[in-house]
Amino acid sequence: MKTLVLLHGHGVDSKIWEPLSTKLSDYQVLTPDYSAEVAYQSIEAYADWLYQWLISVGVEKCTLLGHSMGGYITLAFAEKYPDLLEGFGLFHSTAYADDEAKKEQRKKTLAFMENHGAAAFIRQSGPNMYAEEFAEQNPEIVKNHVEQYSQLPTDAVITGFRAIMNRPDRTHLLSETSVPVLFIFGKQDKLIVFEKNIGLSELPQKASTVILAQAGHMGMIEDTDACADSIKTFLQTT
């Protein structure tokens, strides 16, 4: 049985994968959680923690799929520990570093969190993760998202945010890797803008690209079936 490791993004936890993981029962699906961690000051440190975690649960080979910040961890992991990977994927994520404008925006967001706490940040950012039409049609899902993740500890949310801010560009890794790479994009994603990132899918030797026309940044919730089918198809290539 193949092992699939799903890495959650920033401002959520591993429960975000529950709707999707139930549709992937033919695989061993692992969903590590680092949403409350405060010890890791860089994306590379999260990747080192993940390596130790995988070894501790007996994983020798896996496919790693990272959502948003989880994608940044995935790339750092692929750079440091390639022998463990049969394949990897970026799920609403990017290999680019932040440009200067984005870094300035993040500094303001960081100051907001330091002054007002993580709950205020989640109330502001959570709804923007979903496509507008989905949010309008599913207000309870968005409301539950905000209520659930407003409980995350502020210091952990800030720690993760700082690591995201300081991550390097890893586009070279996509060009150099020999394992299959999956890209899942949301056409309505306001955070990982489709038009700016679709070109990344041309870099790997073996790439599979999925475009979710109606999804924003939360395809595992907005279009669960399409995501599950795409992942199953991809795992057949690894």
Task: Please place each PLM-identified region on the residue numbering.
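The conserved beta1-alpha1 loop
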Residues: 7-9, 185
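Active-site glycine-rich loops that stabilize anionic/oxyanionic intermediates
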Residues: 9-12, 68
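Active-site loop/oxyanion-hole signature of alpha/beta-hydrolase fold enzymes
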Residues: 15-22, 27-65, 80-81, 229
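Conserved hydrolase catalytic core segment
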Residues: 61-99
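Short beta-strand/loop motif that positions the catalytic acidic residue
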Residues: 177, 183-185, 189
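Catalytic histidine neighborhood in serine/cysteine hydrolases
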Residues: 194, 198-217
